[in-house]
């Protein structure tokens, strides 16, 4: 029988008289990588916040067998990487990674040897030993993303929630970060739920996709089942070519239509 460390039933979030999330049902198996896709405003970040208990919601959330757990229970089970995390510029890598131990440290004590060991292990796992004494402001975008992941790993939660983990990275660093997440998932038996805008990367890395549109689940399944030209046209308002190979979806190529072309770019004129 499959174990679902993360599950939700009829999960609904309302704000300002609007439903941001509407009766979402969710089951994520242990060790699975679930990709959340959908256009901007579809409800991906709201779903993360509802799972974390950061917004008021109705319906049922089950995490590691606990139904509608309190925020501390969720913090112990879920490590969240937001799309734009705050990085205190003068803080060192080691200090920032240690913040991942916050759910384990009570108000009346400082970090223990166990906390320090967990942070050190995360730094080593993300290959950050040489950077651990550097200030965050001196790091490149790719290095910062590894530090953010190290903080999540130091938390020792069984599930990672990643909200656009490759935002603002070039394609090389996007592949590097997602490959790193996949390695950590397999080595440490982690479950991953991530929001990904790039549909080709979502197809290549995620075991299963959940397509959200206006707060509702409109498609769910493998990349082959979800990333159809019909779905992309209906929910992204984009015509596309979906390239397939023997393993399923290989790439999603949006088509530029004539309506999008406004003014021809004039030819470059060389200086005399």
Model-derived regions, located:
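Conserved ABC ATPase "signature" region
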Residues: 113-131, 156
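Conserved ABC ATPase signature
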Residues: 135-139, 143
